[in-house]
């Protein structure tokens, strides 16, 4: 089995449904919270973590349906998470999700899922994901810790500076092919120069170079 990694964006008009109200459902809700998904939770009871999160903001994006799952609850859903301990409920959710052509994750049954959530590091708009089919969890955990040591405050500021540079380029030249040749060469040379500084002098020096380049942009 192979995987197809993607990042979902522009989700404002899409519905995500969580079946279940326990701690696993709470973690899944937290992972969806900062997306633009419309979120629906269906469960006869909710744990304190879910109650705290959904009452945190008046404009909460979450609709709560306080009853057990029923066939038909996944109509118009794009993404579905079943986080219950009832295998019969999970099986029925899986059947309906397949019929409705939803993305479906049964949290305790990978065989009845067509997606799962990787381990992630999130720093603003920078997301680093760790995922493997049948890989060693300890090795992935070690790799994650290595990345955590690399991605410090200076690296985040470097990333944000390069992001602003690209945003300004896109603003001035919405069509990538319209970038004048001299500007294109300047940008490509800067990219190569930045990586060279990063490798030879470290993150702080690269951040300084990126900020200086940003100041010179129109």
Regions found by a protein language model. Name each.
Residues 39, 64, 103-104:
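Hydrophobic beta-strand scaffold residues
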Residues 106-156:
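E1/E1-like adenylate-forming module used to activate ubiquitin-like modifiers
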Residues 79-85, 90-116:
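ADP-ribose/adenylate-binding Rossmann-like module
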Residues 55-75:
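Glycine-rich, highly charged phosphate/nucleotide-binding loops
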